[in-house]
């Protein structure tokens, strides 16, 4: 039964990822006053399927000097970790109800760094290695603020479980009392998923393609899938943390529709940002985090810790 549930979670996610690539190309196309893909199928709707067929039927080329095992393990690990992070997400019921689901997701996203590092190191290419080192530094740095923001949200909800956040936000979204946190969280998720304007790992002008420069065909497709799975997952997590919907146990499908709509809108915002903003310089990226976000998130975390203690002294208003 668990395997059936797992497949019923993973299959729609992979399908959503496939069509997210099409949505991205269409949105970027219309923003640049062109049509985007229109050849394969009606309105280009079958483009993701043809892309998948093309990538997986190509010969998986491998550099002679690369470390074979690690070279092939890295993309597999990247996708496996990206899909594992969907397990504790309540939609409205999670696949397994963990008490420490937020910690689990944080741990999984930290492990994703290894896949990137292995791919850059095993490729035995300078471009790939520089791209991987950048990605690792960026991901580890932004995880610091993500963890502190999560801690602040946990202080507001009072539990490490994601399901509790649905009850916490029954009457009011957490984005309203903690909007600075939500803004910093959204920008940090952009950096965490290596999206524009933080896509320094894939700086085409300087690194050709970043850590996946030596990959082609199937392994490249796995990296691609992992990246877009992480994007949707991060937006789903943002929805649960800050835009939680009321879940009526009699009509759970209403929650699911609400949840997916918000996730879709946030993903559209990701694509819109990509079309609008130029890439940051590397020192600006690090400066933004260590000099701006970190002090702010720490101060806000202390504030949310102190707030219940301060208000506990106020006599009840009758």
UniProtKB/Swiss-Prot annotation:
Catalyzed reaction equations: a ubiquinone + NADH + 5 H(+)(in) = a ubiquinol + NAD(+) + 4 H(+)(out)
Family: Belongs to the complex I subunit 1 family.
Compartments where found: Mitochondrion inner membrane
Membrane disposition: Multi-pass membrane protein
Keywords from the named record: Electron transport, Membrane, Mitochondrion, Mitochondrion inner membrane, NAD, Respiratory chain, Translocase, Transmembrane, Transmembrane helix, Transport, Ubiquinone
Primary site of residence: mitochondrion
Top-level division of the source organism's lineage: Eukaryota
Transmembrane segments annotated in the record for this chain: 2-22, 70-90, 102-122, 147-167, 171-191, 222-242, 253-273, 294-314
Molecular function as annotated in GO: NADH dehydrogenase (ubiquinone) activity
Keyword set includes Ligase: no
Function of the protein: Core subunit of the mitochondrial membrane respiratory chain NADH dehydrogenase (Complex I) that is believed to belong to the minimal assembly required for catalysis. Complex I functions in the transfer of electrons from NADH to the respiratory chain. The immediate electron acceptor for the enzyme is believed to be ubiquinone.
EC number(s) reported in the record: 7.1.1.2
HAMAP family for this protein: NDH1_NuoH
Source organism (scientific name): Diaemus youngi
UniProt-recorded name of the protein: NADH-ubiquinone oxidoreductase chain 1
GO biological process: aerobic respiration
């Amino acid at each position: 039964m668990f395997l059936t549930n797992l497949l019923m979670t993973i299959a729609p996610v992979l399908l959503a990822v496939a069509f997210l690539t099409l949505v991205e190309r269409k949105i970027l196309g219309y923003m640049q006053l062109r049509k985007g893909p229109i050849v394969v199928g009606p309105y280009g709707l079958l483009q993701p399927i043809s892309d998948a067929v093309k990538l997986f039927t190509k010969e998986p080329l491998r550099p002679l000097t690369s470390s074979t095992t690690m070279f092939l393990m890295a993309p597999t690990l990247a996708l496996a970790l990206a899909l594992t992070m969907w397990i504790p997400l309540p939609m409205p019921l999670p696949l397994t109800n963990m008490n420490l689901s937020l910690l689990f997701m944080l741990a999984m996203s930290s492990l994703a760094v290894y896949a990137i590092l292995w791919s850059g190191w095993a490729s035995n290419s300078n471009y790939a290695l520089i791209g991987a080192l950048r990605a690792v530094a960026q991901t580890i740095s932004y995880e610091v603020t993500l963890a502190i923001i999560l801690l602040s949200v946990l202080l507001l909800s009072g539990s490490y479980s994601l399901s509790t956040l649905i009850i916490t936000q029954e009457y009011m979204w957490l984005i309203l009392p903690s909007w600075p946190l939500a803004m910093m969280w959204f920008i940090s998720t952009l950096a965490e998923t290596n999206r524009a304007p933080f896509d320094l790992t894939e700086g085409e002008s300087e690194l050709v393609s970043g850590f996946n420069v030596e990959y082609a065909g199937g392994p490249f497709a796995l990296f691609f899938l992992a990246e877009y799975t992480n994007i949707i997952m991060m937006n789903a997590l943002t929805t649960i943390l800050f835009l939680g919907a009321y879940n009526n146990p009699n009509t759970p499908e209403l929650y699911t529709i609400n949840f997916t709509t918000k996730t879709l809108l946030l993903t559209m915002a990701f694509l819109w940002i990509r079309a609008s903003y130029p890439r940051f310089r590397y020192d600006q990226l690090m400066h933004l985090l260590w000099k701006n976000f970190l002090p702010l998130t720490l101060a806000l975390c202390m504030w949310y810790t102190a707030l219940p203690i301060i208000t506990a002294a106020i006599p009840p208003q009758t």
